[in-house]
């Protein structure tokens, strides 16, 4: 059972993976489409990021079948991409030091010298 929304997302995921773009999953519909895409092309799984596991029982089953573990579990079942939005914000927060901190060279820290 499914609709054109799942078919459309499946095609979108296949295209995103073909272009080397990450795919952030959110909820049962997006995970169902992801599973369909993985069944068509197993390499798609390498591009999937499970933002959260919703309260819907099917969510955990789909993530298990995809071999993915969500990094955010907050008991959410709001819909409309809220889990993915929260997940992306958390990823941005985690990447901020990597992207914004200067290197040792940029701040004049000398290279490590072993003690003798």
Task: Please tell me what each predicted stretch does.
Residues 1-116:
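N-terminal loops that bind phosphate or other acidic moieties
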